[in-house]
């Protein structure tokens, strides 16, 4: 019985939140595109210049999904853009969309540790991955493959909310693209 009440109150809160979002004023937002390299993204993430906000979910990709994403970059395939909120007061950027991708690249290239079980981050040993990269850590890639991965550019859409004076655009954008 308590669980049902909790579910009902969650639904009511969610409805109220959606109504509040629907009644927001019009936004005044500046947005621009950028094409940072993977090297730039993981350096900024490592140094705390790009952060995961509380609204973002935790890391949820499994190793197969993460491996396929890295392989996509190694193959030269296009990947979705990331969304970053520019916070003028701190000079930081918050990841609105793209956390799984940025974290995967950071962990593979920078840490070399798979978050799921703290093992060495190797691409999966499966037919879904090109045999050239199958079961390899970043350090085991050829120098040209390492360079290709680090130099790969991922399009970023960066925005800065000017009005209203709260951060509601961040929530609106997050909710609409996720």
Regions inferred by a protein language model and the residue ranges of each:
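Basic- and aromatic-enriched surface patches that contact anionic nucleotides/nucleic acids
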Residues: 2-14, 18, 22-40, 53-178
């Amino acid at each position: 019985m308590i669980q049902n009440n909790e579910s009902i109150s969650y639904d009511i809160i969610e409805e109220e939140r959606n109504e509040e979002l629907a009644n927001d004023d019009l936004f005044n937002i500046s947005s621009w595109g950028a094409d940072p390299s993977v090297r730039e993204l993981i350096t900024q993430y490592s140094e705390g210049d790009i952060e995961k906000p509380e609204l973002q979910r935790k890391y949820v990709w499994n190793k197969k999904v993460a491996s396929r994403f890295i392989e996509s970059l190694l193959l030269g395939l296009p990947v979705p853009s990331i969304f970053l909120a520019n916070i003028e007061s701190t000079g930081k950027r918050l990841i609105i969309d793209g956390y799984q991708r940025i974290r995967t690249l950071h962990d593979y290239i920078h840490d070399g540790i798979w978050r799921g079980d703290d093992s060495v981050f190797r691409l999966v040993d499966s037919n879904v991955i090109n045999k050239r990269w199958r079961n390899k850590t970043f350090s085991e890639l050829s120098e040209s493959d390492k360079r290709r991965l680090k130099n790969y550019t991922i399009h970023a859409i960066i925005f800065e909310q000017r009005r209203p004076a709260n951060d509601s655009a961040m929530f609106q954008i997050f909710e609409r693209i996720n």
